[in-house]
Amino acid sequence: KEPVTENTKKVARCFYALEQDRADKKRYPAVNPIDSYSKYIEYPEFEEYIKGHINDEWIGKVNELKTRLQRGKEIAEQINILGDDGVPVEYHVIFWKSELIDFVILQQDAFDEIDAVTPMERQEDILNMIIDICHTEFDFDNFNEVMDYFKKMINVCKQMNYSKFKSEQYEGFQKQLKELIAERSVNS
């Protein structure tokens, strides 16, 4: 641990933990979502503002996604140690749901006119879409099916990120995503 960073974290109300590993993997912005934090989210004034301007459930949803990212990181470490066959298929589903959160919500293309600036309405729509997927139970026989399926899903969602909000193209990708979810959803 680096002393300047550790001492800064003690006094800072908001901290972006830049991570070389994320930069090396081209996961931009290269900010570690687990080590980064904002104390402002705990302030009652901020909570009131969010409830009044966005949604009563926004902070809870953000905290849920952070928890899912943490769980995904823990499972990734287990997979690295035990191998893909060494963990249950359900662990792969949890891991890939965390990857979905990372690729679709946290990563951003600063060179894309649409993805570079995301209005709050669009953020809320995408956040709800991803949370719904995270709450969906899927059926897979092996880890390869999980990986292939979620890579397709991530690709469709990324295309939505590059499409103008509520445009025909955006709606088309949304329809494609719903069909993809229905393919493996236990409840469909």
Functional labels for PLM-detected ranges:
Residues 172, 176-188:
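C-terminal accessory/interaction regions of large nucleic acid-associated machines
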Residues 1-158, 166-169, 174-177:
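P-loop NTPase catalytic core
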